[in-house]
């Protein structure tokens, strides 16, 4: 018989229920191990400024899974998802844990972070994750990766037009780029819409919300890939 959930885990499962996500004891164990390994590695390298247990569960894990507000919790089976500029693994690793039927690719430019991600994936026993050490602008120029994914997503700190140039080239025609942003992104959206159009995409919807049970305001921007992206994008670094 499983022990009763307490503290951050109990609140996490209650919050996820509002997204219609239910986790098995094994998945909860994986989130627990992810948290513990994140804190361990964070002592020797800068992975996150958020370290309190409940904050990690809410502002990293729950926030990463808020993508179901656009995709739907039952829609991830057999989807290919790429997380560009994943950092400490957000949103990609929570998506991989919660939706084992999805194939998740993580891309990050820093070898030390890639080392953390590799150890974490092995520790958690995740078989649906691939990790690449690459700059986003270089990865998007690899022919085998272009227009290869159903969904590209990113929580990276960059303006919408920059994220669009890194991510839209990786998305299949008919797929989506989804950006996780803070509450106020109005000033970014004009240039974001323009960039999306040049890259073959169209902003389909923008949803702003509070994470369930918190006062944490978030926005998701969903861009539909309607046309093929010109081979000149993403532009090389420094251009």
Each model region followed by its residue ranges:
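Class I SAM-dependent transferase core
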Residues: 2-78, 82, 115, 119-129, ...
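Conserved beta-strand signature within the Rossmann-like core of class I S-adenosyl-L-methionine
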Residues: 174-184
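Short alpha-helix immediately C-terminal to the canonical SAM-binding loop
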Residues: 113-115, 185, 189
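Residue-level signal for inorganic ion chemistry
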Residues: 38, 95, 181, 223
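Conserved SAM/SAH cofactor-binding pocket of Class I
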Residues: 65-158, 164
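Short "lid" loop at the C-terminus of a central beta-strand within the Rossmann-like core
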Residues: 137, 182-186, 211
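SAM/dcSAM-binding transferase cores
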Residues: 190-239
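Helix-to-beta-strand junctions that scaffold the AdoMet/dcAdoMet cofactor pocket
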Residues: 99, 171-173
């Amino acid at each position: 018989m499983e022990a009763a959930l307490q503290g951050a885990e109990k609140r996490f499962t209650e919050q996820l229920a509002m997204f219609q996500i239910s986790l098995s004891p094994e998945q909860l164990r994986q989130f627990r191990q992810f948290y513990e390994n994140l804190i361990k590695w964070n002592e020797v390298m800068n992975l996150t400024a958020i370290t309190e247990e409940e904050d990690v569960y809410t502002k990293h894990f729950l926030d990463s899974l808020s993508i179901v507000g656009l995709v739907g919790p039952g829609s991830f089976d057999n989807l290919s998802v790429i997380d560009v500029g994943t950092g400490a693994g957000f949103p990609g690793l929570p998506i991989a844990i919660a939706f084992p039927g999805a194939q998740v690719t993580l891309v990050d430019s820093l070898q030390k972070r890639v080392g953390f991600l590799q150890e974490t994936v092995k520790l958690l026993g995740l078989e649906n994750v691939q990790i690449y050490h690459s700059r986003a602008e270089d990865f998007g120029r690899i022919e085998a990766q272009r227009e290869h994914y159903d969904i590209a997503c990113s929580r990276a700190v960059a303006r919408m037009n920059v994220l669009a140039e890194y991510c839209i080239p990786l998305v299949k025609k008919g797929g989506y780029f989804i950006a996780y942003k803070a509450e106020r992104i109005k000033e970014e959206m004009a240039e974001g819409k323009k960039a999306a159009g040049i890259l073959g995409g169209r902003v389909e919807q923008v949803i702003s919300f509070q994470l369930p049970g918190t006062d944490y305001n978030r926005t998701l921007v969903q861009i539909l890939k309607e046309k093929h992206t010109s081979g000149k994008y993403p532009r090389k670094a420094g251009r």
